[in-house]
Amino acid sequence: MEQLLVIKIGGNVIDNAAALQSFLEKFSTIKARKILVHGGGKIATKIGDQLGIQSNYINGRRVTDAATIDLVTMVYGGLVNKKIIATLQSLQCNAIGLTGADANLIPATQRPVVYPTSNNEAAAGSDLLGIDYGFVGDVDSASLGLQSLEILLSNNFTLVFAPLTHDGNGQMLNTNADTIASTLAVGLSKKYAVRLIYCFEKKGVLENVEDPNSVISLITKEKYHQLIAENKLFDGILPKIDNAFDAIDNGVNEVLIGDANDLLQNITINTIGTLIK
């Protein structure tokens, strides 16, 4: 099977112009078919402040009210995405900027508010309990526009996705970029040998959060459960690893987690970052 790379970058790259330029220069040289999924970084908050749109968070998650969904659609789908596209085009990488609404590529449903009931034990244990995050989308993975994605990839386009989906009724939805990346990776794994790469601010998954060099080179499910039992993983990394194992269980060959530039410099070997397999 032909190789496909699905790479996700977050705020540590998006918010740093020099880091983003360096990343895109390396990314543009990758010969394999590739998809880039980017987060929004702090730019939406900065522009929101300038426009008088307050940013609200609950449990570290952005609340996407009516004003905010308009803001992030403009910033993520417009400013951030198109600056990435323009840079890649300048590097002779024929990229196309997309959201989940384009060609109905990534349909989603608005996340409902969950309230406790006497027979809803799952809800009672959830940190999302009784909280309305607004216009946030949960991806409908069964309805991905796979045929359109494959046509774009087969015509040598590099796909660059903003973290936005839609509900099919005209409403844009703010959606977790990690989830978009893993959903695309799984959906395309029947046609391609997919490697999913999560880039973030550390060199990999750390055994000791105080030691930036304590990178765990390989995490299997057995190792993962052991690390959780020993309380060695910080909360922020758990959703990434959960997404990684979900992707592997559903057809993705392997997942790498680590620093963006380190991973791209060593894209053909697995000695950098953390391999989830």
Residue ranges, per PLM feature:
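C-terminal catalytic "cap/lid" subdomain
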Residues: 1-277
